[in-house]
Amino acid sequence: MLTEQQINQLDWEKVDHLMPAIVQHAVSGEVLMMGYMNQEALAVTEKTGKVTFFSRTKQRLWTKGESSGHFLNVVNIYPDCDNDTLLILVKPIGPTCHLGNSSCFAPAASDWSFLYQLEQLLASRKSADPASSYTAKLYASGTKRIAQKVGEEGVETALAATVNDREELTNEASDLMYHLLVLLQDQDLDFSTVIGRLRERHEK
């Protein structure tokens, strides 16, 4: 959340007391929507932990998800360098767009957003009927089998690289990534945890 100093430095006069607020998925990085906040909306957002805007058409505060239940739970808020725009990192509950899309800017999803969506799909297969998909069958086969597949795909990826076959390397690396994501989900981990560890090591 914003510090007291950051709040005091916000330039409300410059934006006629309606500050643009860009909402971004805290994990996938996908830009979800943009709205406007007055000082009261920002205060409510900070207090409740749910993104609340000021509606220019209705001339009142409105909390995203108040009617649909698709709230935007705040992870953090950052001001830009001019203190006249806010970036709000969130974890959404359900789709953000009223059309049912994850983002109001869909289908402009980034590669990272796709990876997150794939991870969510793989997670949903953990409790599915093993006969319904290869992924569900893989989960049902147990951790040892999943780990074995990661090892096999790792070797095949390395072999593809040694013969300079870029097409095969791409295919094998894709298989490796898929099975690694399945293994992480099997262990109740997600890719953002791995990224966090890499970031920690980079900052040392």
From Swiss-Prot:
Keywords: Amino-acid biosynthesis, ATP-binding, Cytoplasm, Histidine biosynthesis, Hydrolase, Multifunctional enzyme, Nucleotide-binding. GO terms for molecular function: ATP binding; phosphoribosyl-AMP cyclohydrolase activity; phosphoribosyl-ATP diphosphatase activity. Pathway: Amino-acid biosynthesis; L-histidine biosynthesis; L-histidine from 5-phospho-alpha-D-ribose 1-diphosphate: step 2/9; Amino-acid biosynthesis; L-histidine biosynthesis; L-histidine from 5-phospho-alpha-D-ribose 1-diphosphate: step 3/9. GO terms for biological process: L-histidine biosynthetic process. The keyword ATP-binding applies. It catalyses: 1-(5-phospho-beta-D-ribosyl)-ATP + H2O = 1-(5-phospho-beta-D-ribosyl)-5'-AMP + diphosphate + H(+); 1-(5-phospho-beta-D-ribosyl)-5'-AMP + H2O = 1-(5-phospho-beta-D-ribosyl)-5-[(5-phospho-beta-D-ribosylamino)methylideneamino]imidazole-4-carboxamide. It comes from the Bacteria. Residues 115-204 are annotated as: Phosphoribosyl-ATP pyrophosphohydrolase. Residues 1-114 are annotated as: Phosphoribosyl-AMP cyclohydrolase. Its EC number is 3.5.4.19, 3.6.1.31. SUPFAM superfamilies: all-alpha NTP pyrophosphatases (SSF101386), HisI-like (SSF141734). HAMAP family: HisE, HisIE. NCBIfam families: histidine_hisI, PRK00051.1, PRK02759.1. In the N-terminal section; belongs to the PRA-CH family. This is Histidine biosynthesis bifunctional protein HisIE.
